[in-house]
């Protein structure tokens, strides 16, 4: 079995570090596996990792400690660095190289006055470089020190000079330091804006640090957003990989090429944005006509990378822009295969893809469907989602391993859910379950996946048998399906049975005439002439049977070899050819038949009739009894093997004690005689009182008595009791075995009609056979309706109909019990609430004291308040339900009480409405009276004031 890819769908993808993105870059580049559960960033391509590593390096172009260490290692560097930091240049000689080193130090440590002093008075070289080719202008721009950069440029510093590694110029340094002033200063001094564009220009460095203003200035002054070489990193790649949406927008507004590819992986900007879940960047790229299904070197689309990294936001965006959800990449995998990476987010991606129409049964080049991968990784939620969307659980890999096999071993919790789906496939109409008009509809579409229509209709049942879940065949849906299938192929089986019956009868007649008929020695033994004709007919029929076996073997040798009936058929065919030979076909002298042919004929005639019994046992009406016989025979053989040593012991002992007796003269005959004596055929008188005297009387009597007690009494009864101890269980087991054999028989017959060996046969004949064998020719018609209470409905046997009826009745009773329990809970809560509302509210203890105006909080009042505010309990539910009749009466009484309560509530509501209306009228009258009183008081006040003023004037 193919366990090579267990829990591995992308074994060449890289991990993302859980730590800060600025740390452990080497580890980020080296680890290869699937993203873990704890990692939420997804998986990255090689190109994305390359961009990430370069961005970490360019965030701090040159570390200050590293620069200081480089300057100190120069000749006299430590002394010069100390002088620059102290600002004293008295010991600096004009003809010494120290002045150039001091100029570099001044550009590093940011001293404008000292820089100008060195350039004017010491004639320092503005283009001097350290051991790594870095000039003072490099350091000034890297430190974003525009004044020093201006001074250096005024004294002739070269703005386009490279460092020793040909990696950066002063413009690169200014862009990396986010210095707009330095960039403008350099551009005004004729700095080449596209210098280094073959690898990485200043625009790349500005994007590395997300310097939006610098990017805008560079683009405004003519920076090229594209690169002249193919498969090189463009600024758009850099911005998309980092998720800098504003930079992406600026680049796109300046005609950046959205189709350009980068690196050996040939990834586009949309690939980089999709695999890192930068939704805004992806949206901008798609709005500017980026190809939604563009492919990289591995034939992956952005949707594949988004699913691999579990970028659900980007997945939804790409689907909304028409991404092909069924596009395949390496090894024939689809986006649905790629989405099964980690369980925490796989379900969201899978749901989005399935909603967009992803093919849930699409297999990769190894035969693995998404259901296989989900089951292997033990993602039960994804497994159930796939099954809900029509995934074929019978789909097999190239190693012939079904998805159901993975489900049973890796996600066994799906099996009960599968049983629930089988239950839900049997539905009844709205009629009462005991009504004659009650109809039950059985939907077989779950048993016949859409992808298996070209392989027959019993593939699921065979898969259940294969993985050890054959008890599911006893489900009413499966049992009904098997019965209907049997009814469809019954005609083919009857033809086969008739053919075998004819063959057995002719062969039996031939054996009787050739091998059984007794002739006197002095007479010539001659058979009738038609016996030779029968012999030739037997040979022809036998060759046809062997041809059928050859066809079945060519159809599938592995499946053919595992059925013992096929080996029995080859044994019979070979034996018949040995029995019906030219010597036996001649009827003039039957005494010339060799003795060995009599032995062969005796064995073959037994096997022929045994095979006919097994064929008859395939009928449902006889199958249980034949299976019970087979089961008991197998059990009896096991027990006989367990006690074979005891029988051998007694056989040898009898051979020693009774060697004169004919049955015990030979050890072989002695053993066979011991087995015969188990059935009770002891022959005590013949052995002890016959013609032969017992040589060892005492020992012989003891051994014989021991045999009678241990074997005839104990062992025989024990074996019979163990073999048939549980008749009811034996019937159930036999019924299950019958269903298994019936399913295998139907499947084998169907497989012959769909065999590739019949492609050259007439098409009309094959289609006729298929229509005769298949239950329905259309998937939408895989439904069957019965009326269990209608005596005229005889479509199904009574036992199957009863099982279907029980399942529907139990489910309906269970639902009614749940509804009844919910009603009782709601009614109890409502009745208690109503009682609390009708209970008078005790507010005496809330009245304030006459003197203090505060509430008197006594222990009695507090207890009473607690009782009033205590929440109503909803747990007073009866533990045991009443009988059905009592429950119905109680529900009617409760409904009457509820109606009365609702009427009282309506009356109270009407009274409250009247009270509210009266209160509103009272408040309006009170308001008018209050306004009138206020006006009168104002008028009286004015009148009093006028009277008082006139009185004062008169008094004066």
UniProtKB/Swiss-Prot annotation:
Residue spans, topological domain Cytoplasmic: 1-491, 547-565, 623-638, 723-956
InterPro entries xrefs: Ankyrin_rpt, Ankyrin_rpt-contain_sf, Ion_trans_dom, TRP_cation_channel
MF terms (GO), sorted A to Z: calcium channel activity; monoatomic cation channel activity
Main location: membrane
Glycosylation sites: 666
Placement of ANK repeats on the sequence: 132-161, 166-195, 198-227, 231-260, 265-294, 298-327, 331-362, 366-395
Locations listed in the record: Membrane
Reported tissue expression: Expressed in various peripheral nerves and the central nerves in embryos. In adults, it is expressed in sensory neurons lying beneath the bristles around eyes, neurons innervating the bristles on the back of thorax and neurons in maxillary palps, proboscis and antennae. Expressed in multidendritic neurons, which mediate temperature sensing, as well as non-multidendritic neurons in larval epidermis. Localizes ubiquitously throughout neurites.
Extracellular side: 513-525, 585-601, 660-701
GO terms under cellular component: cation channel complex; membrane
Record membrane topology: Multi-pass membrane protein
Parts of the chain that traverse the membrane: 492-512, 526-546, 566-584, 602-622, 639-659, 702-722
Protein keywords: ANK repeat, Glycoprotein, Ion channel, Ion transport, Membrane, Repeat, Sensory transduction, Transmembrane, Transmembrane helix, Transport
PROSITE patterns attached to this UniProt entry: ANK_REP_REGION (PS50297), ANK_REPEAT (PS50088)
GO biological processes: calcium ion transport; monoatomic cation transport; negative gravitaxis; potassium ion transport; response to heat
Family: Belongs to the transient receptor (TC 1.A.4) family. STrpC subfamily.
Self-association and partners: Homooligomer; between isoform A and isoform B.
Annotated function: Receptor-activated non-selective cation channel involved in protection or tolerance from high temperature stress. Activated by temperatures above 40 degrees Celsius. More permeable to K(+) than to Na(+). May act in stress protection allow flies to survive in natural environments.
Protein known as: Transient receptor potential channel pyrexia
Organism of this sequence: Drosophila melanogaster
